[in-house]
Amino acid sequence: MADQTSQNDNQNGSGLPGGGPSGTGRGRLIIWVIAGTLLALWAYSYWGMGASGGERISYSEFRTQLQQENVERVEVKGNAINGSLKSQATRSEQGNTIEYQNFVTYLPSFGDEQLMDLLESQGVNVVTKPESSFPWGLVIMGLLPVLLLFGVGYIFLRRMQSQGQGLFSVRQSKAELYDKDEEDTTFDDVAGADSAKEELREIIKFLKNPKRFEGLGGKVPKGVLLVGPPGTGKTLLARAVAGEANAPFFSVSGSDFMEMFVGVGASRVRDMFSEAKETSPAIIFIDELDSIGRKRGAGLGGGNDEREQTLNQLLSELDGFEENEGVIVMAATNRPDILDSALTRPGRFDRQITVDLPTKQSRHEILKIHAREKPLSDDVDLEEIARSTPGFSGADLENLLNEAALLAGRHGHDAIQYSDIEQARDKVMMGLKRDGMVLDDEEKKLLAYHEAGHAIVGAVLPNADPVHKVTIVPRGKAMGVTQQLPEKDQYLYRHDYILDRLAVIMGGRAAEELIFDTATSGAENDLKQVRKMARKMVLDWGMGDQFKHISLGEDQGNVFLGDEIAKGREYSDDTAREVDEEIRRISEDAFQRAVDTLNEHHEAFDQLADMLIEQEEVSGKDVLNLVNGDTDEIGHMPTTNGAAASEENGSADDHEPDEATVIEEDGESGEGRASGSADASGS
């Protein structure tokens, strides 16, 4: 390989100057030498041609010397007159006196008809020379800009060649071929996703022994699409396939196809498949497929779309007129909803493998993999961490342990302690503590009652998730947080569970009106969450009293993703009015349930608010003891204690695991870490 590289370098540098970085310098030097020579020739043609030397004098001074009969000899060439005087003459210039005997001057443009008669009358020796007939000055002045332009272009091209970026290499594929010996990722490094790994193992088996399947009349899928939320390990699975497969593995990002030049994307697709066919059987992996695979016809413009041209070429290569045997295409995306239907049909991407958020057992396995090279103290229970992190993706868990390791180093620990992991969870999910934010007594009391309202309602209602921690310590954008941890992963939401959760979210606003007889802006995010959830109950889930067995919801398509410009609702104005009334009724019922619960447990409500004002953080166990009247069991929370929490603001019908509920008091936006469930709330 080294000999081949050396040969290529010699070929690049032999025929032309500037075949490499040093050649580029030589080429630049040659250009400057040529430009300097042309400039000198032009200057000579403009100032020097016809003037052999002498003091430059005016024509009037020349006539004066001629009238004084002091001119001995002149040489005329065109308009230039060179001559010598019989005796030295003087002239003043800028206050200086200059003596001269040889001189140079030029005839005026209108000529001098008496000059020759005057020269002959005084016996001056006159010599004439023919003027050059070729206009060198004009030619050089015209060629100089053109030559300079070519010189700049020459340097630019040589520089591109020295960097391996020839003029036409922009059309070549940017897919990288992974070496099996260099790629050390295997399926053992991928925890969870067992069904996805099994599907991919089947692809690898076909590549290793295709006759086993062909004998049964089976054909390998032409395309495999990995679909799932961000951070669930889709790209990691592809790297594992590269490490396991005994076949060439080409990897490219969807954005690598697009450039500023027209036609580059389609050309790169052709080149990529051409390379893969030469080494077939082979695997091509396209990461972030949605960057080139979006629905055609998207947007409001009617012009040609370079992305669509690239997509059309990809469709043709996957299942076009020519057979594409021996090449399997893998792709990954977290936006399958915007992919073109022609791309996802059978015959192109035959299989869609869903890589979902990990379950509790999968989270435990993922934590064990990421903790391999991290020293853990004896008090760290990875299974407990997995239980308390519902809704976390693999990337979230990796980041959690990394933040814990950084905190352990900051605290001077020899190993990662459980307190480091708890602090890391609070930091990752709620942000840093805002130590510089100081609340006055009135705001602190209002915030304490607001969070106490969430916590008491959450601890009393039977279907609500257990309260884990309540704090009024400002973190990130949140001024206060009530954390709830589900007892298990939850994929479906019951009607009574959603109603209890709505009441918990309304607990903060109910507390404000009960204690202070007013409302604050801190409940802004609470109200948004309630409206969003109540609307889904009525329109999508059939949980309204008036619309129990009908879905009125409709996906609102995005025109820039290929959907229609406008979509009208499919129900009447009267029905829309009833929907609004139903949403209002659900919200009011949730608020009233929260008020009734706080009135019923007003003593525990006041005690919890006082504890928050004094301690700023209260554990969920202490909240439950207050509700049950077991005040003797109440202890003080250490300041290092934390709990896993996440804000859920997706859709409950996504069938994703339940997550920790975070109810935030926030005067700004109340937004926390989005994790993907519908029933989280923030205030």
Swiss-Prot record:
ATP binds at residues 228-235. Binds 1 zinc ion per subunit. It is a multi-pass membrane protein. One of its GO terms (biological process) is protein catabolic process. Pfam families: AAA, AAA_lid_3, FtsH_ext, Peptidase_M41. It is found in: Cell inner membrane. It comes from the Bacteria. Residues 50-136 are periplasmic. The active site is at 451. Keywords: ATP-binding, Cell inner membrane, Cell membrane, Hydrolase, Membrane, Metal-binding, Metalloprotease, Nucleotide-binding, Protease, Transmembrane, Transmembrane helix, Zinc. Residues 1-21, 627-683 are annotated as: Disordered. The chain crosses the membrane at residues 29-49, 137-157. Residues 1-12 have a biased composition (Polar residues). One of its GO terms (cellular component) is plasma membrane. Residues 672-683 have a biased composition (Low complexity). Residues 655-669 have a biased composition (Acidic residues). Signal peptide: none annotated. GO terms for molecular function: ATP binding; ATP hydrolysis activity; ATP-dependent peptidase activity; metalloendopeptidase activity; zinc ion binding. Zn(2+) binds at residues 450, 454, 526. PANTHER family: ATP-DEPENDENT ZINC METALLOPROTEASE YME1L1, METALLOPROTEASE M41 FTSH. Homohexamer. Acts as a processive, ATP-dependent zinc metallopeptidase for both cytoplasmic and membrane proteins. Plays a role in the quality control of integral membrane proteins. This is ATP-dependent zinc metalloprotease FtsH 2. The gene is ftsH2.
